[in-house]
């Protein structure tokens, strides 16, 4: 795997890493700060944000920075903050350093944060946001925020540090002195992240470096291999490491395969290119896709995770050294001295789509479609209560309150759980008086003393922050006035824990007593990416219960911790392992999302969304995001719920939403403006208004999704990049005009091909291999190359 020559040249790479790279420090002066919403006051060199007793007040300060980067370079934003008076609790985005980016190409990245605790006992704390941009940045907006909480907080010493030394390149965000580094054999490098001046060192398989031992089992496969990796600490202390596997690329024109519609040619001196997204932990971001791919002269090379054995990872291509690499951020601790995971190396042809097809062939279980029928998602509401419910295409029911009726009418019923959360309502004795986290803690301890299972699970599972405090916060929502406690979802925590209380053996035996399809059809996992859950859990008592590797914090200490994305993966994987043998399914809200390993264990994905803003202006999801969700779902159903004000979401908006769904074979659905009240399907005046749209478009979504999306379109090509074409099964193609104007597009297909069109009707002929369609903005067409099939209605 790595010969002597490889070790020698990797040593050259390691030696080329430099410390003390030149930085420009920009102090964010208070005179340049602008008010955010209700603003701030100044006390000397400090910013003061005082919300008083108003829990709805939003205030803070904001700076605008013009960066105008010619190449992507990392920078850090830092401030210090303390709470003088607040409700208590642990770190929250409501009290944070917050950074938004606008790239030079106009794209954006919102909401990278360093969070603080609204707890006066914490004193001054530093918060740092490390930005590792995927492409050059035009500008950044930096916020010091205190939103939706009572009390008063202070910020001081805000500053930005930017790497500006012209003769430096970056290798996985580490400065590298430019030079003609020779190409080398593939192999591993390791860096000790807790040492700021530490570079990469080669580490041989079966050998040691920087106090860790590396073991690798290689399983060759057609056009590639799978590597099972174990990293073991030999020092007995906390560790924060980045392990890199680097694969040299041959000579030739280099292309970064960014996504199914984007290929980026790279010059030999181009900066590193990656798909990683910021997660607020580790030494860098987390890959959005489960693999990274490049092409050289038309031949493809890719590295990706094994979804059965994931770790926190990113892939990147480094043109100056002609390396494709995969980097793993690994935490090790006395409580968990090893990290075990697996990744794949493979070749392909056909750009990103060919890479995705090749990856899916290596991960057949991850992309397997298990549900026999597909349709739209109904949250909570009894389907039988909807007038002429058959018109809407219901198939998946969130909530098991009418299982017998669902069985009789072909509806798949899912039991609701929400991992990581315990919504604790406070006693009515509190009335309208404000309560604190201390009050909520006292109630939990009282319940635990009485033997309450939820409280006992809290004792074994509650997450801990960097100070060892239990993670929770005061909440006032339509469904709970009290506190939310955040719990580890790991299924193998000893004793009573979150997973075992919410997923008892007795419940599974009862719900799945009879063979499918009789009874409950699966488990519904809400908030599967834990939108309220902190990124890291520092509870050392549960480190050993984790099967997946630890990661580490991105602050100055780089402490080992559990990453919620991997802990939630273990929850979902365990649930799938229990229901699949029973012929049942897993449905999850928020999947596919930001964690590329989670879709592998989800049979029905979906999300709650808003495609209009508060004023009712149309704000659709990007086509990049829509295609990402379809691609990682492959042939599995993906379902939407619009959570909007349905008086503002007009008939035309609903039709446009459904046309977008048809283009990608996704399922349109509706819920509530606040995910609780005013359920769409309790309101005949709105669902009857939209009934014709459901009857027209949902059968098309079903036809396409059940046929199965194909990453490689072999039927039709578009000559206009603004007109998207996607293939489903062997015979269907969707055509969508994303342009803001009507276009006449030339489509190419096999000479003599003919297709029926299922949206507006009629036939499309490719007599000479070309057909022309005139499409209005956001118009969709569905071509069916089997002319004998009637239009579904």
Walk through the language-model features, giving the residues of each.
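Extracellular and organelle-lumenal recognition/adhesion modules and their flexible linkers in secreted
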Residues: 16, 22-212, 222-224, 235
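Short strand-edge motifs at loop-to-beta-strand transitions and within beta-strands
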Residues: 61-63, 125-129, 324-326, 771, ...
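Carbohydrate-recognition beta-sandwich/jelly-roll modules
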Residues: 161-166, 182-439, 521-522, 531, ...
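Active-site-proximal substrate-binding groove within the catalytic cores of carbohydrate-active enzymes
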Residues: 334-344, 406, 564-746, 751, ...
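The substrate-binding groove and active-site-proximal loops of carbohydrate-active enzymes
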Residues: 374-397, 477-514, 519, 553-568, ...
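Active-site-adjacent "subsite" loops/lids of carbohydrate-active enzymes
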Residues: 412-518
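Active-site neighborhood of glycoside hydrolase catalytic domains
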Residues: 503-597
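C-terminal beta-strand-rich structural cap/linker in extracellular carbohydrate-active enzymes
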Residues: 767-793
């Amino acid at each position: 795997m790595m010969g002597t020559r490889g070790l020698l040249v990797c040593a050259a790479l390691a030696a080329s890493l430099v410390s003390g790279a030149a930085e420009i420090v920009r102090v964010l002066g208070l005179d340049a700060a602008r008010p955010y919403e209700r603003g701030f006051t100044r006390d000397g060199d400090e910013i003061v944000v005082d919300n008083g007793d108003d829990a709805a007040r939003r205030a803070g300060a904001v700076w605008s920075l013009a960066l105008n980067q010619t190449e992507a370079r990392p920078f850090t934003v830092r401030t210090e903050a303390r709470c003088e008076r607040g409700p208590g609790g642990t770190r929250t985005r409501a009290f944070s350093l917050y950074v938004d980016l606008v790239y030079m190409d106009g794209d954006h990245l919102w909401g990278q944060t360093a969070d603080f605790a609204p707890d006066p006992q914490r004193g001054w704390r530093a918060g740092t946001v490390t930005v590792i941009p995927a492409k050059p940045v035009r500008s950044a907006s930096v916020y010091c925020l205190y939103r939706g909480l009572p009390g008063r907080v202070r910020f001081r010493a805000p500053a930005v540090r930017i790497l500006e030394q012209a003769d430096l390149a970056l290798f996985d965000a580490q400065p590298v002195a430019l030079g003609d580094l020779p190409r080398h054999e593939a192999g591993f490098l390791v860096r000790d992240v807790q040492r700021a001046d530490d570079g990469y060192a080669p580490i041989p398989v079966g050998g040691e470096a920087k106090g860790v031992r590396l073991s690798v089992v290689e399983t060759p496969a057609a056009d590639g291999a799978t590597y099972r990796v174990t990293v073991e600490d030999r020092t007995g202390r906390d560790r924060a490491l980045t392990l890199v596997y680097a694969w040299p690329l041959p000579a030739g024109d280099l292309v970064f395969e960014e996504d199914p519609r984007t290929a980026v040619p790279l010059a030999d001196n181009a900066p590193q290119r990656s798909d990683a997204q910021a997660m607020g932990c580790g030494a860098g971001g987390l890959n959005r896709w489960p693999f990274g791919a490049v092409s050289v002269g038309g031949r493809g090379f890719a590295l990706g995770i094994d979804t059965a054995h994931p770790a926190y990872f990113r892939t990147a291509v480094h043109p100056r050294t002609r390396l494709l690499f995969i980097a793993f951020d690994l935490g090790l601790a006395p409580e968990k001295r090893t990290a075990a995971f697996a990744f794949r190396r493979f070749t392909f042809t056909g750009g990103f789509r060919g890479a995705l097809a090749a990856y899916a062939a290596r991960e057949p279980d991850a992309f397997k479609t298990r549900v026999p029928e597909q349709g739209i998602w109904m949250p909570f509401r009894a389907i039988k209560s909807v007038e002429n419910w058959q018109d809407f295409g219901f198939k998946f029911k969130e909530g098991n309150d009418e299982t017998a009726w669902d069985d009789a009418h072909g509806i798949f019923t899912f039991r609701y759980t929400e991992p990581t959360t315990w919504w604790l309502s406070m006693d009515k004795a509190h009335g309208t008086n404000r309560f604190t986290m201390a009050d909520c803690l006292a109630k939990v301890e009282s319940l635990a003393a009485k033997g309450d299972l939820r409280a006992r699970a809290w004792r074994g599972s509650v997450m801990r922050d960097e100070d060892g405090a239990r993670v929770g916060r005061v909440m006032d929502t339509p469904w709970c006035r009290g506190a939310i406690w955040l719990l580890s979802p790991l299924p193998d925590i000893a004793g009573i824990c979150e997973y075992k209380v919410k997923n008892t053996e007795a419940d599974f035996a009862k719900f799945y007593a009879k063979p499918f399809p009789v009874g409950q059809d699966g488990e519904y996992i809400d908030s599967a990416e834990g939108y309220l859950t902190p990124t890291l859990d520092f509870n050392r008592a549960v480190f050993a219960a984790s099967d997946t590797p630890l990661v580490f914090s991105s602050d100055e200490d780089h402490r080992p911790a559990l990453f919620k994305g991997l802990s939630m993966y273990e929850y979902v994987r365990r649930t799938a392992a229990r229901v699949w043998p029973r012929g049942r399914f897993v449905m999850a809200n928020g999947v596919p999302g930001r964690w590329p390993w989670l879709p592998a264990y989800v049979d029905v994905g979906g999300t709650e969304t808003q495609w209009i803003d508060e004023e009712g202006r149309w704000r659709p999801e990007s086509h990049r995001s829509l295609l990402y969700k379809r691609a990682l779902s492959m042939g599995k159903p993906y379902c939407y719920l619009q959570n909007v004000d349905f008086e503002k979401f007009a008939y035309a908006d609903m039709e446009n939403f459904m046309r977008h769904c048809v283009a990608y074979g996704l399922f349109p659905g509706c819920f509530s403006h606040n995910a609780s009240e005013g359920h769409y399907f309790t309101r005949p005046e709105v669902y009857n208004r939209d009934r014709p749209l459901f009857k027209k478009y949902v059968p098309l979504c079903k036809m396409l999704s059940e046929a199965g999306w194909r990453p490689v379109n072999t039927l039709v090509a578009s000559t206009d990049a603004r007109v998207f074409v996607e293939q489903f099964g062997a015979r269907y193609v969707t055509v969508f005009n994303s342009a803001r104007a009507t276009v006449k597009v030339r489509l190419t297909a096999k000479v003599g091909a003919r297709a029926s069109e299922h949206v507006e009707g009629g036939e499309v002929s490719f007599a000479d291999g070309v057909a022309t369609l005139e499409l209005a903005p956001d118009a969709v067409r569905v071509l069916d190359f089997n002319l004998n099939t009637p239009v579904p209605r």
